[in-house]
From Swiss-Prot:
The keyword Hydrolase does not apply. GO terms for cellular component: cytosol; membrane. Gene3D superfamilies: ACP-like (1.10.1200.10). GO terms for molecular function: acyl binding; acyl carrier activity. This is Acyl carrier protein.
Length: 78
């Protein structure tokens, strides 16, 4: 796993209180990890802070899996 993927996983575990082994790149925040819309907003804000990226609302709406978040961050971080 890349450094970005490791950091994304850590944030997801901390914010959603799920086991690390459930957080893989294919895991859906809502369907697999039990997140709700507020959790998603908090995760996006945590990703923005951790990685120094801005994730606009239209992009955030397309991020539904851990892999989506990792890919977006890797493509947009400085």
């Amino acid at each position: 796993m890349s450094d970005t993927a490791d950091r994304v996983q850590k944030i997801v575990v901390e914010h959603l209180g799920v086991e690390a082994d459930k957080v893989n790149q294919e895991a859906s925040f809502i369907d697999d990890l039990g997140a709700d819309s507020l959790d998603i907003v908090e995760l996006v804000m945590a990703f923005e802070e951790e990685f120094g990226v801005e994730i606009p609302d239209d992009a955030a709406e397309k991020i539904s899996t851990v892999g989506d978040a990792t890919k977006y961050i890797e493509e947009h971080k400085g």
